[in-house]
UniProtKB/Swiss-Prot annotation:
Its main location: cytoplasm. This is Adenosylhomocysteinase. It comes from Rhizobium etli (strain ATCC 51251 / DSM 11541 / JCM 21823 / NBRC 15573 / CFN 42). Pathway: Amino-acid biosynthesis; L-homocysteine biosynthesis; L-homocysteine from S-adenosyl-L-homocysteine: step 1/1. Keywords: Cytoplasm, Hydrolase, NAD, One-carbon metabolism. GO terms for cellular component: cytosol. Its EC number is 3.13.2.1. The gene is ahcY. The lineage of its organism: Bacteria, Pseudomonadati, Pseudomonadota, Alphaproteobacteria, Hyphomicrobiales.
Amino acid sequence: MSTEKDYVVADIGLADFGRKEITIAETEMPGLMSCRAEFGEAKPLKGARITGSLHMTIQTAVLIETLVALGAEVRWASCNIFSTQDHAAAAIAAAGVPVFAIKGESLEDYWVYTDKIFQWADGGLSNMILDDGGDATMYILLGARAEAGEDVLSNPHSEEEEILFAQIKKRLAASPGWFTKQRDAIKGVTEETTTGVNRLYQLSQKGLLPFPAINVNDSVTKSKFDNKYGCKESLVDGIRRGTDVMMAGKVAVVCGYGDVGKGSAASLSGAGARVKVTEADPICALQAAMDGYEVVLLEDVVSSADIFITTTGNKDVIRIDHMRQMKDMAIVGNIGHFDNEIEVAALRNLKWTNVKPQVDLIEFPKGNRIILLSEGRLLNLGNATGHPSFVMSASFTNQTLAQIELFTKPGQYENKVYILPKHLDEKVARLHLDKLGVKLTQLSEEQAAYIGVKPQGPFKSDHYRY
């Protein structure tokens, strides 16, 4: 492990390999490269000190270097202990950006690294957060609440919360008052994923959100592309790399049929699996049924299916009682943000055999075994390398525009959660059309007036669902 200077990566010697893959990814990320061309000279992020907590992949490296090209200073950690690509982290560290990320890092190190991305060499403070899942934001807000005398650290509900609370207490002891100062210095946060967005909305509803936030996840060019088309390619990739199992003919259960569930079901179906769906929402259940999937109760298929994938963003979706009933060598994995969709903690007292990194064989007393991927964390990033560069370009272009929006317009946004305006959503889509050879039909003035839009757009109302 290399710990010199202001970074922690697995092997700085991987930097050249990482740089080669970054160069390839740049050709597949036209949105980010267009942002560099459009904003690089003006440097709208000059003065921004961005704390980034997002999967440290090759694609994220292109995002980081785009933010730097636009004038920002950046410190970065991964938002998942298994999602880092070590050569990507090495390349970014070698380029002079402080990064703290190792594939397979411990939970203790994860929260130490989350603390480090707020610790600037000159003792200054971050003024922007770019988050995925909300951990960096929650770290600061929990610490500030503790400094205010609230009893928020005395009752951890999980092993991870216990570790998080210990790290907060360590920083409280070392730097009294720091959390409050850091919270007050933040101009805004941009949030990448459904889980983190839900956290922000809950804070906003309670009046506890201390700075403006942009919900990047619900930009159409994020949720309808990254969540759906990204999962459509990366889920099966992760299962194959982890298990080498043939999916054709297997029975696969997808828990949840939101955008991630839709992409996951399509991924498995495209590989030849016979897909069944579980769903609590009647609208999503009807969509699944009309897309041709059998919508079932998990309890009715748990002993007969071969593959189980959670996509819900909820907790305890697959519980230990379910896993006890699974057939021998059933594959269990998650593609939602956190690891609590599968009741992994309840499996810890069973016999675990590590097959290879992020693949574990867990044996129940009656002799049946399950294959657990990435310990219940994101299997497409733990067992594979996540979504392809092209679809991540759309997501990360939204992130870049959102960072510019909040940083350059202080005072224009209240302490609420916002979505990028429709014209920017359409702009992100436009930036990716040439790469695919797409030609847009041009509306005449008369046609545009007939449907109540401008010929150049936006073409849909904010409530249009796509």
